[in-house]
Amino acid sequence: MLILWTIPLFLLGAAQGKEVCYDNLGCFSDAEPWAGTAIRPLKLLPWSPEKINTRFLLYTNENPTAFQTLQLSDPSTIEASNFQVARKTRFIIHGFIDKGEENWVVDMCKNMFQVEEVNCICVDWKRGSQTTYTQAANNVRVVGAQVAQMIDILVRNFNYSASKVHLIGHSLGAHVAGEAGSRTPGLGRITGLDPVEANFEGTPEEVRLDPSDADFVDVIHTDAAPLIPFLGFGTNQMVGHFDFFPNGGQYMPGCKKNALSQIVDIDGIWSGTRDFVACNHLRSYKYYLESILNPDGFAAYPCASYRDFESNKCFPCPDQGCPQMGHYADKFANNTSVEPQKFFLNTGEAKNFARWRYRVSLTFSGRTVTGQVKVSLFGSNGNTRQCDIFRGIIKPGATHSNEFDAKLDVGTIEKVKFLWNNHVVNPSFPKVGAAKITVQKGEERTEHNFCSEETVREDILLTLLPCKTSDTM
């Protein structure tokens, strides 16, 4: 069904209305920049709060599986709930065609409960999101105003600080968060999970998510290819203090499975269909979900472009360190600047998405031959696979380096294993070795050196141990 809905709903809409006002929310017009522009040509007004029927579903550490409904019209529902003023409050706001009781929304709360005590409020506006895309994009304004109203009730009635509020919005939900933030002075943080492009990219700041909407705005871009012709749903525009572009921000690894295997997904037909239609777009919240339980597995590197990142021009982290994409990005919030900052990293194809980046530099010994070289790292937490370091003419004394992303943080590196081959019959049986291999983890400035005086024939592993002091001189 989602396949049949998605594209037509992006295109449908109707022209009507000029201005409408709602109690406690203010007035909404169809004047520029909200409508009648090249980006927003259709003149639509947002639906009424009654028609959208936004619900605020509270989960806490005390009720992690059954929500309590908080009502804007009755603050006593907050007082009677498990909401605790001493805790941070994180709102999770879904996007187009989604709903507040979707598995990923509830799972995000559950992951949080494993690492913190928190008020987790799922914002359900499915009646306003399950319509034509253009109408849903306009309904964002009312839903954002309602989220701001809920925060205002917390501030006024419960002496709660807006600085303790974190809004997490996916797709259209990211712009809901932006609207709420623009109405809430001192809002602590907004996380935009692949903010949607259509009707928002290139608009003035009051229409979309932007850095002024909270003290700290971080954004994860996973579907930033142009909507036409590539059907990329997310925006490529930098709209936060920190904008993260995992895997380049456009095409996520693991999203190119064939249609049947993608639709008949292990999580069921519905989840599989969603992934087939919008796999890249959905990866943003999947990365965030996993980041909650992996506080150091999504280190992101400041870099001018993904091409530079893949060309090994952005390693290691600068002196001030690298932020972690996702839940813990705000630990780096003191390093925000006036200009938006762009960060890159790679992820895995599927769970587990977390990766740890290493650079390996090796100096050859032995004969001059043509071949390819791989190394694997062994540490206190485990070992990596064999990773490609060099392919070409292997010359003794020459040094080559490469970077790779490991599925685990190996911990304290204890040894390195070297392997070479060329699969060419050579009656002289040449031997090649690595006199020294230097390993550096991306988040660290320290280099670790491993040495060997041996050489080996192809396809035979050579183990290098930490260099003696005299070996590194």
UniProtKB/Swiss-Prot annotation:
SUPFAM superfamilies, per the entry: alpha/beta-Hydrolases, Lipase/lipooxygenase domain (PLAT/LH2 domain)
Domain PLAT: 356-467
Protein keywords: Calcium, Disulfide bond, Metal-binding, Secreted, Signal
Protein origin, superkingdom: Eukaryota
Expressed in which tissues: Expressed in female, but not in male, lacrimal gland. Expressed in male and female sublingual gland and pancreas.
Phenotype of gene-disrupted mutants: Mice have no visible phenotype during the first 10 weeks after birth and are fertile. Adult mice have normal body weight, but higher than normal body fat and lower than normal lean mass. They display impaired glucose tolerance and decreased insulin sensitivity, and obesity and insulin resistance are exacerbated by high-fat diet. Their pancreatic juice has greater ability to hydrolyze triglycerides than that from wild-type littermates.
Presence of the UniProt keyword Secreted in the record: yes
Disulfide bonds: C21-C27, C109-C120, C255-C279, C303-C314, C317-C322, C451-C467
Keyword Calcium attached: yes
Cleavable signal peptide: 1-17
Catalytic residues identified in the record: S171, D194, H281
Gene Ontology MF, one: calcium ion binding
Subcellular localization, as worded in the UniProt entry: Secreted
Gene Ontology CC: one annotated term: extracellular region
InterPro entries named in the record: AB_hydrolase_fold, Lipase, Lipase_LIPH, Lipase_N, Lipase_panc, PLAT/LH2_dom, PLAT/LH2_dom_sf, TAG_lipase
Family statement: Belongs to the AB hydrolase superfamily. Lipase family.
Function description: May function as inhibitor of dietary triglyceride digestion. Lacks detectable lipase activity (in vitro).
Record's protein name: Inactive pancreatic lipase-related protein 1
Species for this entry: Mus musculus (Mouse)
Lineage summary: Eukaryota, Metazoa, Chordata, Craniata, Vertebrata
